[in-house]
Amino acid sequence: MIYEMRTYQVQPGKAAEFLKMYEAKGLPIISRYARLIGCWVKESGVLNSTVFIWAYDDFAHRTSQRAVLSKDQEWIAFIPEMLPYLVHQESVFMTPAMFSPNK
């Protein structure tokens, strides 16, 4: 199992609007291809940031799922709606430690 921690920094003052839009439009699409572990809003550090953690079986699974997602016509239509909100995006891949309950 691998986890992708994907952080979106959004335009100041637009975080609530971004989350509402993502929940209504983006989440139903991407959830077909990845399992959402959780979504958080940063309260310290780099503000105006939302962190999603997605689970995949392994890197090959993530790669294949993202390839299919990138061809999904609903996702393709959604991307231009999301981009104006974004200032920065970062993805970090993590594997669970041997004692982690999330394996």
Description of each model-found segment:
Residues 16-20, 58-71:
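Short amphipathic alpha-helices within nucleic acid-binding modules
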Residues 1-17, 98-103:
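Surface-exposed interaction/gating patches
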Residues 14-38:
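Short amphipathic alpha-helical segments
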Residues 11, 32-51, 57, 74-103:
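Glycine-rich beta-strand-turn "strand-cap" elements at beta-sheet edges
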